[in-house]
């Protein structure tokens, strides 16, 4: 059964907290529930350091956590450090009975640097690809075997896995039992890729979907 959730970025922005900074956590999740969503992702207003309180607030509104972003830094940090952080992330999701863990490699992302444009993104090296895919396979195996949570990789604009070619390489070099795809039609469109074609191409690896409103609008890159 397909269930629909929503990300709190529609209320508050994690990268630019001043956007929606006046909106409370309670307002955010109440409006999610009133809109009819079954679940949500996790934002910066969520009381993640008080799990009983967070669980109570979500259960009160019949919401469940469906995913939480994780910034992998397998190309930048020692694997044991990434795994330690990842396990804490997985334990949080497990507490809420979530089945999916999303995120992307951020060790070489252009995000956070306003002086670098999307067109200045540098392709990853062979060594970086090896670090990423080997690390994802191990983290995905650990996550599913120890906690029953599937690693769902989010192809993301401005990161080393952005284009269809890069997504295809990631899928080819990771184990299908350990690494799935968090499909995002908006990020494929912004990368000038065929969103529908990509969905058809990778449908057997997709276990989590991010939907974006882009139909009938001008080119994403032109708008940006």
Task: State where each predicted segment sits.
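Histidine-acidic metal/acid-base catalytic patches
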Residues: 1-36, 59, 87, 92, ...
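Hydrophobic faces of well-ordered beta-strands that scaffold small-molecule active sites
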Residues: 2-11, 40-42, 65-70, 101-103, ...
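A short alpha-helix capping/helix-coil boundary motif
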Residues: 6-10, 31-35, 67-70, 117-120, ...
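Active-site mouth loops of central-metabolism enzymes
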Residues: 10-24, 43, 71-83, 121-130
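Acidic-and-aromatic substrate-binding clefts and catalytic sites of carbohydrate-active enzymes
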Residues: 39-53, 72-84, 157-163, 185-193
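Flexible loop residues that form catalytic
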Residues: 45, 106, 214
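Aromatic-lined substrate-binding rim segments of carbohydrate-active enzymes
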Residues: 48-63, 67-69
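Active-site acidic/histidine proton-transfer and metal-coordination neighborhood
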Residues: 79-181, 190
């Amino acid at each position: 059964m397909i269930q629909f959730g929503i990300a709190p970025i529609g209320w508050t922005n994690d990268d630019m907290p001043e956007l929606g900074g006046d909106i409370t956590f309670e307002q955010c999740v109440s409006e999610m529930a009133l809109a009819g969503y079954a679940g949500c992702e996790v934002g910066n207003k969520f009381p993640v350091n008080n799990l009983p309180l967070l669980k109570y607030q979500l259960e009160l509104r019949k919401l469940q956590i469906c995913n939480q972003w994780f910034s992998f830094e397998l190309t930048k940090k020692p694997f044991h450090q990434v795994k330690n952080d990842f396990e804490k992330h997985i334990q949080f999701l497990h507490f809420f009975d979530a089945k999916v863990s999303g995120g992307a490699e951020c060790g070489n992302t252009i995000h956070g640097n306003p002086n670098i444009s999307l067109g200045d993104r540098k392709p990853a090296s062979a060594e970086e690809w090896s670090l990423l895919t080997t690390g994802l396979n191990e983290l995905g195996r650990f996550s599913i075997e120890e906690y029953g949570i599937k690693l769902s990789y989010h192809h993301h604009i401005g990161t080393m896995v952005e284009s269809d070619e890069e997504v295809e390489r990631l899928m080819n070099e990771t184990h299908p039992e350990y690494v799935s795809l968090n499909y995002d039609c908006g990020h494929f469109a912004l990368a000038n890729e065929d969103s529908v074609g990509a969905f058809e191409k990778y449908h057997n690896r997709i276990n989590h979907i991010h939907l974006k409103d882009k139909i009938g609008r001008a080119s994403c890159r032109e708008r940006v």
